[in-house]
Design a protein with these regions (language model features):
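Domain-level signal for soluble alpha/beta catalytic cores
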Residues: 1-396
């Protein structure tokens, strides 16, 4: 894994804005013979765009993960269910929607009017099948097995082809965590722990395919922290949350067995929804568990207004030797464009706290499907410009 040895490197979390024609092809469930040539071309273009905007460590924009509308918060996890056997759609679960997941959320009680308005807007947006809402009805009813070999190899080959001749430092690909997968209902395994372990066994095949292709594997695990708001915040149950999170760390490490740590980066965030986030658990309550994940780099939110102050945690929490922190220094949570000098300030704070060689500048979360494409690319440009300013200060 590349490090910031002589300058601050830049990357992002994964999702980038999809071309309009690609979104339409996914939305229309176009046949592979029509979709795949467009997908391959789009990946080639997005790799070049990342390089043009100054991103050092690039990916395929997650274009192989189907987005059926321009604004889509769920493609990063919903992509995997067509790659897993063992699920069936139950209409009674689908009708419950996301609300069935957030039964323990103090925030959703305190801001009930806001969330009711958000739900109404989401229902309107989902007309025509443009949302992932029906996926909430998927239920595990049989042994979970990975069946996505062809899909992940397609994505791998598209990225390899796109990188040919490109002036790129390094490339990564994303895959979802067991903790996120186990949120959907289970009607087969005896308990949630057995269910999670089975998911870890299944998804490890995708992890290994990415690493075997010589890409950096990024595991996306928002659930490791945002589950606190959904399931534990009503009773302020930090102890119960930590017990749950500790098991999830064991599960992801099980999935990572045999994969070198220096080929893995691990991403957490507090969810992509544009809400108050008052119920978010603090990084201080989970950082020790985070650092037990067998990854070399940890990708965290640090640019949004609810979590920016948490850089100070690293004054008292030692980043283990050889590890890398990829803090988000531009945010998906706002359309306001970060000034490059602010980006530089954020980078420098981390660099002076944990060492400049241990910092890579990143984004809070994926930008595709969260903000308008023009805003997304402008944020990546600000990220690159800010990293250059930080480099001048740190290496002067």
């Amino acid at each position: 894994m590349k490090r910031s040895t002589d300058r601050i490197l830049t990357t992002h979390v994964g999702s980038l804005p999809r071309p309009k024609d690609l979104v339409e092809l996914y939305r229309d469930n176009s046949p592979d013979s029509t979709l795949f040539p467009h997908l391959r071309s789009a990946v080639a273009e997005v790799v070049q765009e990342q390089a043009r905007f100054g991103i050092d460590i690039v990916n395929d924009g997650e274009f192989g993960k189907a987005m059926r509308s321009a604004m889509d918060f769920g493609a990063w996890w919903s992509y995997v269910y067509p790659r897993l056997a063992g699920y069936e759609l139950r209409e009674e679960e689908a009708k419950k929607g996301r609300g069935a997941w957030t039964f323990g959320s103090k925030e959703r009680k305190e801001f009930a009017e806001f969330y009711a308005a958000e739900a109404s807007a989401a229902a309107t947006a989902s007309q025509g099948g443009t949302s992932t809402a029906r996926l909430y009805g998927l239920t595990c009813t049989a042994p979970v097995n990975y069946t996505g070999q062809a899909a992940i190899q397609r994505d791998i080959q598209n990225l390899k082809s796109a990188l040919t001749g490109a002036q790129i430092e390094e490339a990564f690909m994303t895959a979802v965590s067991p903790a996120t997968l186990q949120i959907l209902p289970n009607a087969y395994y005896k308990d949630r722990e057995e269910y999670t372990w089975a998911l870890a066994e299944a998804i490890r095949e995708e992890y290994r395919a990415i690493v075997d292709a010589r890409f950096i594997l990024q595991i996306d695990d928002p659930a490791l922290v945002d589950i606190y708001d959904w399931w534990f915040s009503m009773n302020d149950d930090i102890a119960g949350f930590r017990k749950w999170a500790a098991f999830q760390v064991e599960a992801v490490n099980h999935a990572l067995e045999g994969i070198p740590e220096d080929r893995v980066r691990f991403h957490i965030c507090w969810g992509s929804w544009h809400g108050p986030h008052k119920g978010d658990v603090g990084l201080k309550d989970v950082v020790d568990l985070l650092l037990k994940v067998k990854a070399q780099a940890y990708v965290i939110e640090a640019g949004n207004v609810r979590h920016e102050h948490e850089w100070k945690i690293w004054k008292t929490t030692k980043l283990p030797e050889g590890k890398v922190l990829i803090p988000g220094v531009v945010s998906h949570a706002t359309n306001v464009l970060e000034h490059p000098e602010l980006v530089a300030d954020r980078v420098v704070r981390f660099a002076k706290t944990i060492g400049r060689e241990n910092v890579i500048a990143g984004t809070d979360c994926g930008l595709g499907g969260r903000v308008h494409p023009q805003i997304a690319w402008a944020k990546l440009e600000a990220l690159s410009e800010g990293a250059k300013l930080a480099t001048k200060e740190l290496w002067s």
